[in-house]
Amino acid sequence: MKXMRKNHPLLKIVNHSFIDLPTPSNISSWWKFGSLLGICLMIQILTGLFLAMHYTSDTATAFSSVAHICRDVNYGWLIRYLHANGASMFFICLFIHVGRGIYYGSYVLSETWNIGIILFLTTMATAFVGYVLPWGQMSFWGATVITNLLSAIPYIGTTLVEWIWGGFSVDKATLTRFFAFHFILPFIITALVLVHLLFLHETGSNNPSGLNSNSDKIPFHPYYTLKDLLGILLLLMALMILALFFPDVLGDPDNFTPANPLNTPAHIKPEWYFLFAYAILRSIPNKLGGVLALILSILILAMFPLLNTSKQHGLIYRPITQTIFWTFVANLLVLTWIGGQPVEYPFTTIGQIASITYFTIIIILMPMSNTIENNIIKL
């Protein structure tokens, strides 16, 4: 079996990636989230596949087909809630994974980092088109508001929006194509994950100390497979608690009402994991400026490898940048809170301050603290 594992053309790839992979001996639990994201992706694809067997992407029947899944399909309610709450677990793991990358300086592996940003954007696109499918009030108005932002693009904006809609408003054509996108994008994400792993295994994994770990590596199996298994069990337990006891806690009550183009909800907002970007979008009074800020709020992650001037790898021995990092995390939580609040004083002001702070921390404060800490080392 051992000879087959090491010599068989297909098993050899699996062996080099998950069994005999040389892994730093000191990586902590923060490194578990990569494997947890893989599990989340598998759960989403499997539950999504079963939901797609019963869902109809037609404006007249989409809402009732989701109700039919919950009421008439065997364990349909469970599959639906695992899928909906699985998306939330996916984004929790994703945010922690990116946060760990920033904290421990994983962005120096620029190819892996940049593929990760593309993965993040693709996952956000998948979640957005998926949120439209139940065809509730918030699904419809969320799709209308977010796609309408593209009309801010000079010259081609209006044409582009109507092209995406497949008409002059969000309607049957929009729902059908969004279902097609939602079905195909997870498989594109899977392909990108393989590219992400390919680049990661070219350089080897980063580790908490930030030092070269080539002299101290252990095989991935059994050490980290068992460690990851614990994380997977905890993730599944959290997901089951969420899906069985609090299935609708992260959803929007407006989505229990079928989509009505003649009745606008009092407060249109996306799912909780987009609220930070939505708050940044709303904090700028100009439409085009808001759209640019929204895009930059994610693409700014690509600036980390370029703005990094530190002589040390990661933040483990850098107290000034550590403080700035945790301020950044707190600021993100404030933005998430503001994104879910109505557009009125004092929320608009807090949102504007938090949005300015978001970009200031990444572009100005972190590079400044790098320089200060480099000078402290010289003393």
UniProtKB/Swiss-Prot annotation:
Task: Recall the taxonomic lineage recorded for the source organism.
Answer: Eukaryota, Metazoa, Chordata, Craniata, Vertebrata
- Which keywords does this chain's UniProt record carry? Electron transport, Heme, Iron, Membrane, Metal-binding, Mitochondrion, Mitochondrion inner membrane, Respiratory chain, Transmembrane, Transmembrane helix, Transport, Ubiquinone
Question: Is Iron set as a keyword in this record?
Answer: yes
**Any idea where this protein resides?**
Mitochondrion inner membrane
Positions that bind a ubiquinone: H201
Q: Supply the InterPro entries for this chain.
A: Cyt_b/b6_C (IPR005798), Cyt_b/b6_C_sf (IPR036150), Cyt_b/b6_N (IPR005797), Cytb/b6-like_sf (IPR027387), Cytochrome_b (IPR030689), Cytochrome_b_C_euk/bac (IPR048260), Cytochrome_b_N_euk/bac (IPR048259), Di-haem_cyt_TM (IPR016174)
| Membrane topology, from the record | Multi-pass membrane protein
| Subunit structure, interactors included | The cytochrome bc1 complex contains 11 subunits: 3 respiratory subunits (MT-CYB, CYC1 and UQCRFS1), 2 core proteins (UQCRC1 and UQCRC2) and 6 low-molecular weight proteins (UQCRH/QCR6, UQCRB/QCR7, UQCRQ/QCR8, UQCR10/QCR9, UQCR11/QCR10 and a cleavage product of UQCRFS1). This cytochrome bc1 complex then forms a dimer.
**Any one GO biological process:** mitochondrial electron transport, ubiquinol to cytochrome c
According to UniProt, the name of this protein is Cytochrome b
Q: Which SUPFAM superfamilies match?
A: a domain/subunit of cytochrome bc1 complex (Ubiquinol-cytochrome c reductase), Transmembrane di-heme cytochromes
Per its Swiss-Prot or TrEMBL entry, what cofactor is needed? heme b
* GO molecular function terms listed in the Swiss-Prot or TrEMBL record: metal ion binding; ubiquinol-cytochrome-c reductase activity
Q: Which organism is it from?
A: Necromys urichi (Northern grass mouse)
Q: Where are the transmembrane segments?
A: 33-53, 77-98, 113-133, 178-198, 226-246, 288-308, 320-340, 347-367
Concerning its family, UniProt says: Belongs to the cytochrome b family.
Q: Name one Pfam family in it.
A: Cytochrome_B
